[in-house]
Amino acid sequence: MNSAPRNAGAARSVDRRGFIAACGLLVLLVVRMLGAADATRIFDIENIPVVKYVAVAGRNVTLNCPGVTEHSLVDTLVWRTSQTIAEYVDGGLPLVSSLRITLLPDNFSLHFNPAFASDTDEYSCLVNDRHSPDALVDLLVQDVPDPPGRPLVLSFTSRTVNLSWAYTQDPRNAPINNFVIETRVGENGEWDQVDPLYTNSNEAFYQVTGLVPFTVYSFRVIAVNELGHSPPSKESYYFVTLREAPTGKPVTTIAHNTSATSVYISWKPPPAETILGEFLGYRITYRARDKGTDDDVKEIYIRDSTVESHEIHHLETYTQYLASIQVFNPEGLGPPTTVLVMTDEGVPSKPLNLSVLEVTSTTIKITWREPEKLNGAIHGYRVYYVHQNQTLLHLPILKADAAVNSVYTYTLSNLKPYTDYKIIVAAFTKKFDGEPSEVSQRTDISGPSAPKVVNLTCHSQHELLFGWHIPQTYYNTIDYYIISYRNLEHSEYKDIRLTANSSIVETSMIIPNLTTNMVYEVKVRAASASVINPKQIILGSYSEPKKISLQLHCEKIPQPSQRQVYDDYNLAVLGGIVFSCFGLLLIVLSFLLWKKCFHAAYYYLDDPPACQGANTAGLIDWEAPCEVAGEVRGPIPVTEFAKHVASLHVDGDIGFSKEYEAIQGEALNDEYPSEHSQHPDNKGKNRYLNVIAYDHSRVHLRQVPGQKKHLDYINANYIDGYQRPRSFIGTQGPLPGTFDCFWRMIWEQRVAIIVMITNLVERGRRKCDMYWPKDGAEMYGVIQVRLIREDVMATYTVRTLQIKHTKLKKKKASQSEKLVYQYHYTNWPDHGTPDHPLPVINFVKKSTAANPSDAGPIVVHCSAGVGRTGTYIVLDAMLKQIESKGMLNVFGFLRYIRAQRNYLVQTEEQYIFIHDALVEAIDSGETNIKMDAIGGLVNNIDFIDNQYKLITSYQPKEINLTSALKSVNAIKNRSSLVPLEGSRVHLTPKPGVEGSDYINASWLHGFRRLRDFVVTQHPLIETFKDFWQMVWDHNAQTVVLLSSADNMSFLQFWPNESEPMESDYYRIRMVSETSENNYIVRNFVIQSIQDDYELSVRMFENPMWPDMANPRSIYDFAVRVHERCAQYRNGPIVVVDRYGGFQACQFCCISSLAMQLEYDQTANVYTYAKLYHNKRPGIWSSYEDIRQIYRILSYMPKDLGLLKCTELRTEFDDAAIMTATPDLYSKICSNGSINTHLNSGDGGGNGNDGVPTGNGTNGGLPMSGGGTTTAATIQNGGTVIVKMNGEDNDELSVVVATSNHLNLDHNQS
């Protein structure tokens, strides 16, 4: 039942309270002469005076004895009513009837201390045994009344009740003015004493109005007289007001489509006090927006009040629906909440009236009308044609701006003559291809090829005998021959038309009526009747014209030059054939010898239509369709790839399982020799026993003089890329015993890029050994490797290494050094595959693009050099195939490269990840935007809107929100913006307290680190301590506050300087508060209560960020925040806005993208925005949010310097290293450079590429960071440089490059 408070607007009686403010005893003396004696008097004496006293109960009152003064002689005195009250006899003590009563000795007045209402009476004072008093004393003592009787409920409705009660038993000498009625809501509620009801009169009846339906009430009554309020009566018996239809609306939280025919709606119920009856459930009504009649409305009743979501099915495709949700109780329905939701695009129906308009030998022109049911926004039409079971796709035809039922035409060209084609046309939307319409058509014939003339001789002096062979190529039949001849003295030909028979191979005829001793030119061509229009004759090509002089017994005129060319050509062909046969013989012999020596195991399938096995990888065309395990698989157009991947995902990824099993099955059947890997001297060079290098594709190290042959071995294989043989070298993570071999391979193969996709240790197991120097230079055999710089980013690190061959001859000294770049991906999880493919795609693109065109292969390794290595190589090849051909063949390429190194793409999970990553790559396209192109995209609404839709496409499931949706945590959330389970920030849990590890906060990555930011809502009063617990637990020393505190919903959650805040484990106090450039900076210290540890925290409050009117201030604020963070780079930056949404995430985005722009002059807005959405869905509400990020980036100043203080690196020589505190760092580094009180050195520095460009000795050492170098000289010329160490650059080292002393403010040496 409802327990809502009583309506404040209920009607009440007019307030007529009586009030007496008695500050002392009120005595009213009235002396009057009465003509008749009162019936209650003790003395029935006429005309006796009466003295009246009126008193208030609880106060003192004194009655004077009439006629007695201080000078009166009193022997006896008696005060009495109906009984004696006090008595006095001369010489004795006064006698009184009550301890409250005193007989005053001065004038024998009767004193009551205090007086009660029961003391009301008529008193007489008899002196010296008189029979009658001088006057009667009338005492009236007034008091608050007794409580009325229990109120009774006479009748009631949903909002009123009629009450009646018994009057008070004793009004206590003061009439009842009115009554006060107090109300209680619920069986155990509080009485409403602050705002009770007042009656207008002293009637014992009242109608209470303004009640809440279906609510438990009880009442009590208080009587009111001039003296005040009586005690409350007994409360009435409980009753429940009648029901009414609900007044509250549900609140819609989610409304989106789930398919082309269904939508999903979720809601929160209205407040319980608005249900006004038993909560029976919900009614959902819906209709298409464009259909406004009541007949079209459909309804669904959900008779379960706990349900808060529903999916509506069987809707029309791509249609806007108005859906209304109402609660209902037994009295009826509440007001509706209406939401507009649209079903998804579906499959368009068949195009109408597909037919053939025109046909030629190489073209077919078709026409059609748009489908009857569009089921979406038609983007265009795809035209396929099938020939000999091979399907080909013509380019999509974009939809023209035409009226409904417009006619489309399209011409298929480059077809083969006289060939049957099945033509398929299907409309397509953004998401689906529609149902196809089909038509079959045979192309027309083309003209026959030229006949071959075999005879031209004189038949007589007036006739020629002319013979020819049937054309080598013709279609259907040859119906006619046309012989053309002319006298060379005339330019015009004469034609003779013969009916032909295709079954006759050689035809001869006599050309009559010629002139003797004339030269004639004769040629012939065939002709065929069109199969489309039999009346049309299609002419073929002419034979080569032949010349002859007509005379008796003549011969064909020789043509020396042409004949000579023909003979020379024949000789060349003959010579080429002989040479080719000889070369082929050598190849066969070489192959047999090689097979005998190395036992190569190449096999070829006997069935020509099927694919060659993967064991012929060097010979097969992996881009062509082929049949494997009874299924034909081939390249897939990019427009079809997402649909293809979705089909593989159905039924628990069964399609992927089948494909991967087919690849695995081939690998088991193929046996490639790997004798060098199995050699006893080489087994120790293999990290894993079962991961070996095939002999036919392995990398051979160059022979060192005097070295055994097997010492040319390294566990590495050449692997082809897309249309580039030996594009990669796949290898294992180097072992300590193979470091020298690894670097020899890098040198000999002219490698410029090394790709590493593993961490050194994963899940406690050694995956790879550190084969590069941590600082300075190391020797690995004959190769010296020096670490030049190290750029650490969130998901990968780029190291610049200088390698030098120490054994090259002096004349080649200039070629003995070169730079190698190691791209080290650090975010591949220990188990499985990455959460999202975007960082991997970006890494693949960046690392492969860095390889110079004249460099050797890219070396790729993980731990074994097969799983992640194969994934990387397949992704690169497919991205290039997409760019080149607009299609891709993952299955075929993986089969192909598995013949070059075993186990590439080691798990089915990796195989699935490749497909999902390529779908993302196709959908998103190129997302790295160059700096000079950002401004042009701000007004490209279509581009930004498309990005926004892709960015926000992910919708979390309830399992992803387990902690956030728990009832114990629901009160900690301000809005529907809540953290996902995989990215939420955890607090230290309190034993036995459910939900104590929860706070509405999410981890977000930045440019440098995966956990660079914590985004959270403005704390609620219930979560103040949780917020500071998070800061304490995660060592967060920088807080950015983008919301402002008010006195209503968003309260101040930090302590003032005079009032510290305490928790069970720590104490927070404010140290200072200052204003800087439109923002406030506060410094806090959090001290541990249990041990000697404290944490300094700085808060930057800037509720006006971003100030679009002053773009420079946007970046200055970000720089200021990151400067502070650079001083104490242990924990994340905590970013707070009202709901942990757009503003906070925008700050993180802008900060990270500004660093990326400084680093490589590109910005990947799409990647940051999408990964942020995937960790905290709902932060981007419209495409304008994304557009504003582009707009802010377009204002970025070139001299920002945001990267300068985030990380300092240097090349190390033989300098001594000592640890420095963050305070020393802040003294040395300010705003990204060495502080001015440390003098800059003058020596050599770095060029823009981080390579030392000078040779100074006492000057600045090369430092990397902003691309320039600075060193500081201190005290007696010593030089100091600073380096950030540690996995997250959270250790600071100071390097003293000379023997001079370094004086520090701290106690360090």
From Swiss-Prot:
Tell me the ranges covered by the Fibronectin type-III domain, including all copies. Answer: 147-244, 249-347, 350-449, 450-553
Annotated keywords: Cell membrane, Glycoprotein, Hydrolase, Membrane, Protein phosphatase, Signal, Transmembrane, Transmembrane helix
> What induces this protein's gene, according to its Swiss-Prot or TrEMBL record?
(Microbial infection) West Nile virus infection does not affect expression levels.
Q: What is its main location?
A: membrane
Molecular-function annotations in GO: protein tyrosine phosphatase activity
User: Effect of gene disruption?
Assistant: (Microbial infection) RNAi-mediated knockdown results in reduced West Nile virus infection levels. Reduced ability of C-type lectin mosGCTL-1 to facilitate West Nile virus infection, indicating possible role of the protein as a receptor for C-type lectin mosGCTL-1.
Q: Which residues lie on this side of the membrane: Extracellular?
A: 37-572
Q: Which residues form the active site?
A: 862
Secretion signal, residue range per the UniProt entry? 1-36
Give the GO cellular component terms, alphabetically. plasma membrane
Membrane-side (Cytoplasmic) residue stretches: 594-1309
* Ranges where the Tyrosine-protein phosphatase domain occurs: 656-921, 944-1196
Task: List the subcellular locations.
Answer: Cell membrane
Please explain the role this protein plays, according to its UniProt record: Putative protein tyrosine-protein phosphatase.
| Family classification | Belongs to the protein-tyrosine phosphatase family. Receptor class subfamily.
> What's the protein called, per UniProt?
Putative receptor-type tyrosine-protein phosphatase mosPTP-1
Source organism of this protein record: Aedes aegypti
